[in-house]
Swiss-Prot record:
This is Peptidoglycan deacetylase-like protein FGM2. The keyword Zinc applies. Induction: Expression is positively regulated by the cluster-specific transcription factor FGM4 and is induced during infection of coleoptiles of wheat seedlings. The fusaoctaxin A gene cluster is silenced by H3K27 trimethylation by the histone methyltransferase KMT6. It is an enzyme of class 3 (hydrolase). Zn(2+) binds at residues 49, 124, 128. Belongs to the polysaccharide deacetylase family. Its EC number is 3.5.-.-. It comes from the Eukaryota.
Length: 338
């Protein structure tokens, strides 16, 4: 196209040509930068504590039938409600259930329904024991018993473990490695990435009766193990803020489900924008820890379903996977055979 500038002043002509040139340059600039691609794994887990939670870490001399009935609710009501929610959302077979041996044997029909849903079955003690209160032989006996129970239910050896109440010690870690477990999920060394479990820092507490020079020294670096660690911490779970346990010191019970949902969404949004290292978009994992005792309650269940649907709405860059799937993919990425 030829522009006739005859009759235009030289200054007007130059201005017109400048606008055309500027317009041409803008036309070559994309309207928006493409969104960074990432792969986000949603790891939904359920701890089927039920009555076992009151027998081990939750035991107290003041506990009574009223307290135990909350565990009965978890088994007889909460499990069914959660299974239906997970089925409606379309992720039932992508969930990992951590089931104490006591729950497997006390609620066999509910446990069978979990297995039939296609979910992964992992271990969580027998009576929700505090591993730090057990000697090595007790820990081994419990683990062996629970492995046998899980194998009888699924026909498959379990590969994952979560310490009840996250109470884990060096003996537990050594036992998991000796027994060939693929992963543990009891520790908080990261909140959005898998990593190799290590043998644990040998921490010596300060002894104020001695000279300061006796404790002013760094901790020895622990040995890296072959077991994968999948993040867990108190801010990823439902029970502590939303379930009142009268004789458990860290329970609250009267935090609204909307407050917890907001916290989880805030965490996801930050990771989506800034990635696990805070430098920008990147791949990350997003674990959630639910309980039929808590998320099975009527005033919480709707929020849980809404949260899961919200996560699904993020599209193909977000996928729900079992803990086993996430751990095996981590090993493949590290080029270490599982």
């Amino acid at each position: 196209m030829q522009i006739d500038h005859s009759g235009d002043s030289s200054e007007a002509s130059q201005a017109h040509d400048s606008k055309l040139h500027h317009s041409h340059l803008l036309g070559n600039i994309p309207l928006g930068l493409p969104e960074a691609r990432r792969r986000v794994k949603i790891l939904v887990s359920v701890d089927f504590d039920a009555v076992s939670g009151w027998m081990g870490t939750g035991q107290h001399s003041r506990n009574c039938l009223s307290d135990y009935s909350a565990g009965i609710f978890a088994g007889r009501v909460g499990v069914g409600r959660l299974l239906k929610i997970l089925d409606r959302v379309g992720i039932a077979e992508k969930v990992t259930w951590f089931i104490p041996g006591h729950s497997m044997e006390t609620f066999p029909l509910e446990t069978k329904a979990i297995v039939d849903s296609g979910a992964e079955i992992a271990l969580h003690g027998y009576c929700h024991e505090d591993c730090t209160q057990l000697d090595p032989q007790q820990q081994q006996d419990i683990l062996d018993k629970c492995i046998t129970l899980a194998e009888s239910l699924t026909g498959k050896r379990p590969v994952g473990f979560r310490a009840p109440l996250y109470r884990i010690d060096h003996d537990t870690i050594s036992l998991l490695e000796r027994k060939g477990f693929l992963y543990d999920t009891s520790l908080s060394g990261h909140d959005a990435q898998l990593y190799y479990l290590d043998s644990g820092f040998p921490l010596d507490v300060v002894d104020y009766s001695k000279s300061a020079s006796t404790w002013m020294k760094p901790s020895p670096q622990p040995r890296q193990l072959s077991v994968v660690e999948i993040p867990a911490n108190w801010y990823m779970e439902d029970m502590t803020p939303m379930q009142f346990l009268p004789n458990v010191t860290n329970s609250h019970g009267f935090v609204s489900s909307e407050a917890i949902e907001k916290m989880w969404k805030d965490r996801f949004n930050w990771l989506w924008n800034w990635g696990p290292d805070g430098s920008g978009p990147g791949d990350f994992v997003f674990p959630l820890v639910l309980h039929p005792d808590t998320s099975g309650m009527a005033h919480v269940a709707g929020t849980i379903e809404g949260m899961l649907r919200w996560l699904k709405e993020w599209g193909p860059q977000v996928e729900f996977v079992t803990y086993e799937e996430a751990a095996r993919e981590f090993l493949l990425d590290k080029e270490v055979p599982a």
